[in-house]
Amino acid sequence: MHIFSKEHRFHGGHGIVGGQIPLGAGMAFGDKYHGSDAVTLCYMGDGAVRQGSLHETLNLAMLWKLPVVFIVENNGYAMGTSVERTANHTDIWKLGLGYEMPCGPIDGMDPVKVAEGISEAINRARKGDGPTFLEAKTYRYRGHSMSDAQHYRTKDEVNEYRKIDPITQVREHILKSEYATEEELGSIDTDVKNRVQECADFAESSPYPEKSVMYDAVYEQSDYPFLAHKL
């Protein structure tokens, strides 16, 4: 939610559930208005699709043929409630049918199929054919937070999904396609673990920030009125 990179046009998530959905359509509107061939990928979870803003956005996105791909990461439980308990039907992708929007499911546990499905939707948008609504059926192994006791599922269920873990599938695909060897993958794995550990060590050894930096990188304008009353 809090990962953001303006340089890479990655605009993060939103503190309000589903709040990013109309913003994503707005970005797509801006790109179309300026004649850009950019396509917006707007991600959301299975919990966010119960927000009314989704339907308002799908309607306008289809009406204006906006270059946006809506991608639902359906892990089956949102924060901790099964999708069967929140919807009359569990095929979330069918929500697109009500707006005559191209839509469909993709295997969210298979990165290759995800890439293929999204690439097809991007090409459709760039041709001027408007938005696509995709549901990536996936899974998460851990609770929504540290306080999540996960009473809503069994350990056997989690273990079954671990057998088709996306990272394992990518690794097998790389080896089968001879893009890399076991040794090269092992080296990459070690390098990544070392870099992550370095970041963790740096964070844990760093002092707490001063109160004076509380508002840094919050507002674009350095003279924003609210800043005159900051602590």
PLM-predicted stretches and their roles:
Residues 1-64, 82-88, 93, 98-100:
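Cofactor-binding active-site loop characterized by glycine-rich and histidine/acidic residues
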Residues 7, 44-50, 72-78, 109-112, ...:
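Acidic, glycine-rich active-site loops and adjacent beta-strand->loop/helix elements
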Residues 32-36, 88-120, 163-189:
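Conserved thiamine diphosphate
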Residues 39-44, 69-71, 133-135:
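Structural motif
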Residues 54-57, 116-123:
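Glycine-rich, charged/polar anion/phosphate-binding loops
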Residues 64-84:
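A short, conserved beta-to-alpha structural element at the edge of catalytic cores
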Residues 76-81, 101-106, 151-159, 184-185:
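Short beta-alpha connecting loops at secondary-structure transitions
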Residues 124-231:
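Glycine/aspartate-rich loop-and-adjacent alpha/beta segment that forms the canonical ThDP
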